[in-house]
Amino acid sequence: MILLTFHTRRLVSHAYCGLKPASQKKSIALEMTRPSSNLADFREAFAKAKHIAVITGAGVSAESGVPTFRGAGGYWRKWQAQHLATPEAFARNPSRVWEFYHYRREVMLTKNPNPAHLAIAECETRLRKQGRKLVVITQNIDELHRKAGSRNLFDIHGSLFKTRCTSCGRVKENYKSPICPALDGKGAPESDVQDAKIPVEQLPRCEENGCSGLLRPNVVWFGETLDSNLLGEVEKELETCDLCVVVGTSSVVYPAAMFAPQVAARGVPVAEFNMENTPATTSFTFHFHGPCGTTLPPALARHETELIS
């Protein structure tokens, strides 16, 4: 992870490298147009596309029962997620932050992909057999795309099920439940629950020989930058795709909020599937309103021009 200094050539042209909510950023100037909701027209663009980039956010997982931590109900205990998901919060109170992430991990172990995740994964597999390409660029850290079967996957904000040692830097998959004995039964989200105040030495620790450093979730926190190599790969996909599909994103967290509008700016069709309009909606070719699990499967289903294999 490169901090502070990384800038891509085009996609992050305004230094939107750090993970930040839109309230801390200037708004993007968008062309004010009304996107189409004509599914037949989208399907025509879909049939012609050879390289599809699918960008997903929290909305695609909401139908799996995953808490989004947005809006008036977006609290864990009395804290908003953006106040817990920071390096400063972890430095001040690693026990509280680990309780929060332990809760999220335990919730996710009970969740399954919904029809939107499955439609994306099935489409990727089907198009691969036709010599076409579909990649998924997700802001989600829940791994539901991977669980659904997606393979060309960029988890740009990391994963709940990977840890990083604050001492040696080792990143490792971790699906333990609980992740450590001291967190067993902890992390309840209700506002009247008190912090467990777990001693730091009892929190998740690195198991590398001679290390035993404190582990942290391997996710990108607010104020941190995305991995430069990963962001460079994402940039290449977005610069070469000929169709972009945006699913369940709020378009308010940077740098991901810039991805689809800049694809649209080079004349590539962009289709948004969401429960509501976003700050970027008017820059897109298509907008399909409704639950992603309902609207997306027919949009990505086999087209009549596709060869059956």
UniProtKB/Swiss-Prot annotation:
<dbReference type="GO" id="GO:0005739">
    <property type="term" value="C:mitochondrion"/>
</dbReference>
<dbReference type="InterPro" id="IPR027546">
    <property type="entry name" value="Sirtuin_class_III"/>
</dbReference>
<keyword id="KW-0520">NAD</keyword>
<keyword id="KW-0808">Transferase</keyword>
<comment type="function">
    <text>NAD-dependent lysine demalonylase, desuccinylase and deglutarylase that specifically removes malonyl, succinyl and glutaryl groups on target proteins. Has weak NAD-dependent protein deacetylase activity; however this activity may not be physiologically relevant in vivo.</text>
</comment>
<dbReference type="GO" id="GO:0036055">
    <property type="term" value="F:protein-succinyllysine desuccinylase activity"/>
</dbReference>
<feature type="binding site">
    <location>
        <position position="206"/>
    </location>
    <ligand>
        <name>Zn(2+)</name>
    </ligand>
</feature>
<dbReference type="GO" id="GO:0036047">
    <property type="term" value="P:peptidyl-lysine demalonylation"/>
</dbReference>
<keyword id="KW-0496">Mitochondrion</keyword>
<keyword id="KW-0539">Nucleus</keyword>
<feature type="domain" description="Deacetylase sirtuin-type">
    <location>
        <begin position="36"/>
        <end position="306"/>
    </location>
</feature>
<dbReference type="GO" id="GO:0070403">
    <property type="term" value="F:NAD+ binding"/>
</dbReference>
<keyword id="KW-0862">Zinc</keyword>
<dbReference type="GO" id="GO:0036049">
    <property type="term" value="P:peptidyl-lysine desuccinylation"/>
</dbReference>
<feature type="binding site">
    <location>
        <position position="168"/>
    </location>
    <ligand>
        <name>Zn(2+)</name>
    </ligand>
</feature>
<feature type="transit peptide" description="Mitochondrion">
    <location>
        <begin position="1"/>
        <end position="35"/>
    </location>
</feature>
<protein>
    <recommendedName>
        <fullName>NAD-dependent protein deacylase sirtuin-5A, mitochondrial</fullName>
        <ecNumber>2.3.1.-</ecNumber>
    </recommendedName>
</protein>
<dbReference type="GO" id="GO:0061697">
    <property type="term" value="F:protein-glutaryllysine deglutarylase activity"/>
</dbReference>
<dbReference type="GO" id="GO:0036048">
    <property type="term" value="P:protein desuccinylation"/>
</dbReference>
<dbReference type="InterPro" id="IPR026591">
    <property type="entry name" value="Sirtuin_cat_small_dom_sf"/>
</dbReference>
<dbReference type="GO" id="GO:0005759">
    <property type="term" value="C:mitochondrial matrix"/>
</dbReference>
<keyword id="KW-0809">Transit peptide</keyword>
<dbReference type="InterPro" id="IPR003000">
    <property type="entry name" value="Sirtuin"/>
</dbReference>
<feature type="binding site">
    <location>
        <begin position="139"/>
        <end position="142"/>
    </location>
    <ligand>
        <name>NAD(+)</name>
    </ligand>
</feature>
<dbReference type="GO" id="GO:0008270">
    <property type="term" value="F:zinc ion binding"/>
</dbReference>
<feature type="binding site">
    <location>
        <position position="211"/>
    </location>
    <ligand>
        <name>Zn(2+)</name>
    </ligand>
</feature>
<feature type="binding site">
    <location>
        <position position="104"/>
    </location>
    <ligand>
        <name>substrate</name>
    </ligand>
</feature>
<feature type="binding site">
    <location>
        <position position="165"/>
    </location>
    <ligand>
        <name>Zn(2+)</name>
    </ligand>
</feature>
<dbReference type="GO" id="GO:0036054">
    <property type="term" value="F:protein-malonyllysine demalonylase activity"/>
</dbReference>
<comment type="similarity">
    <text>Belongs to the sirtuin family. Class III subfamily.</text>
</comment>
<dbReference type="InterPro" id="IPR050134">
    <property type="entry name" value="NAD-dep_sirtuin_deacylases"/>
</dbReference>
<dbReference type="GO" id="GO:0005829">
    <property type="term" value="C:cytosol"/>
</dbReference>
<feature type="active site" description="Proton acceptor">
    <location>
        <position position="157"/>
    </location>
</feature>
<dbReference type="GO" id="GO:0017136">
    <property type="term" value="F:histone deacetylase activity, NAD-dependent"/>
</dbReference>
<dbReference type="Pfam" id="PF02146">
    <property type="entry name" value="SIR2"/>
</dbReference>
<dbReference type="InterPro" id="IPR026590">
    <property type="entry name" value="Ssirtuin_cat_dom"/>
</dbReference>
<feature type="binding site">
    <location>
        <begin position="274"/>
        <end position="276"/>
    </location>
    <ligand>
        <name>NAD(+)</name>
    </ligand>
</feature>
<keyword id="KW-0963">Cytoplasm</keyword>
<dbReference type="GO" id="GO:0005634">
    <property type="term" value="C:nucleus"/>
</dbReference>
<dbReference type="InterPro" id="IPR029035">
    <property type="entry name" value="DHS-like_NAD/FAD-binding_dom"/>
</dbReference>
<feature type="binding site">
    <location>
        <begin position="57"/>
        <end position="76"/>
    </location>
    <ligand>
        <name>NAD(+)</name>
    </ligand>
</feature>
<keyword id="KW-0479">Metal-binding</keyword>
